[in-house]
């Protein structure tokens, strides 16, 4: 995915692939700067990602990478390697796309929503960590007064067009078809939007408080049933063509 982004000129955090234990933590930090985040190259539901994955020095990086290579509760987190990338501080958005890259005229790019993290969190903890997402709290603490870890709100209209464009460009760079959710972060220091990842055939739900898809449907006044019908109709249309 990252290689495809780079080839197509899609803005994405600077990254390094780690495929075995023969890594050089100091060299990785030299290339990416700090802070950086390490995460499984392929995962789902934030598995393998926690607040300690964001590191600022070589010692913390070594500790976290060793932990990832050990696995988590029997899960192999590094089957497809590890990605280390610059950690982007700033607001996070997610965009739902239904359609096909080679038929943009028939595709639908839904309005982006912003994932707003609890204000008590430090900047380097404002992302979907496994413990907090699934309310396990083995290594991380819950929000004060049992408040929500995050909430969704509609993207600022001033940047909506730009977020939708970069999301579509990332989708097209991967020859996307079907339905996809694209995660984007805007660097609060530079204003540059960066694609974090494209989540192919992402989980879909009508829960507007907990899930991004539910929130997107809420803000577009569309029902979950209508979304499912849209996805099915798109699949049949591609089959005919």
Task: Locate the predicted segments by residue.
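Active-site nucleotide/adenylate-binding loops and adjacent lid/helix of ATP-dependent enzymes
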Residues: 1-90, 101-103
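ATP-dependent carboxylate activation and anion-phosphoryl transfer catalytic cores
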Residues: 4, 9-10, 104, 148, ...
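A structural signal for short, well-ordered beta-strand segments
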Residues: 15, 95, 112, 182-184, ...
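Short coil/turn motifs at secondary-structure junctions
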Residues: 20, 100, 117, 189, ...
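Short, solvent-exposed polar/charged micro-motifs at secondary-structure junctions
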Residues: 24-28, 92-96, 236-239
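Short connector loops/turns at beta-strand edges and beta->alpha or beta->beta junctions
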Residues: 42-43, 135, 201-203
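A short small-residue
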Residues: 46, 138-152, 212
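Phosphate-binding site of ATP-dependent enzymes
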Residues: 58-147, 158, 162-165, 193-194
């Amino acid at each position: 995915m990252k290689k495809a982004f780079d080839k197509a000129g899609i803005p994405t955090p600077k990254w390094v692939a780690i495929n075995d234990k023969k890594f050089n933590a100091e060299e990785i930090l030299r290339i990416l700067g700090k802070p950086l985040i390490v995460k499984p190259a392929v995962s789902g539901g934030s598995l393998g990602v926690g607040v300690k994955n964001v590191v600022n020095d070589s010692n913390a990086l070594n500790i976290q990478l060793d932990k990832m290579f050990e696995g988590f509760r029997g899960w192999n987190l590094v089957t497809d390697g590890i990605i280390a990338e610059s950690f982007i501080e700033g607001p996070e958005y997610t965009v739902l796309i239904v359609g096909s890259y080679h038929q943009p005229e028939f595709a639908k790019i839904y309005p982006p929503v912003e994932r707003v993290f609890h204000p008590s969190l430090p900047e380097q903890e404002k992302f979907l960590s496994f413990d907090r997402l699934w309310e396990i709290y083995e290594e991380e603490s819950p929000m004060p007064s049992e408040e929500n870890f995050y909430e969704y709100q509609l993207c600022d209209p001033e940047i909506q067009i730009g977020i939708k464009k970069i999301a579509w460009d990332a989708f097209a760079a991967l020859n996307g078809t079907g339905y996809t959710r694209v995660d984007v972060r805007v660097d609060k220091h530079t204003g540059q939007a960066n694609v974090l990842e494209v989540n192919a055939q992402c989980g879909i739900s009508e829960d507007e408080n907990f899930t991004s898809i539910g929130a997107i449907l809420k803000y577009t006044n569309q029902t979950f049933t209508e979304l499912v019908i849209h996805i099915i109709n798109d699949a049949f249309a591609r089959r005919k063509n």
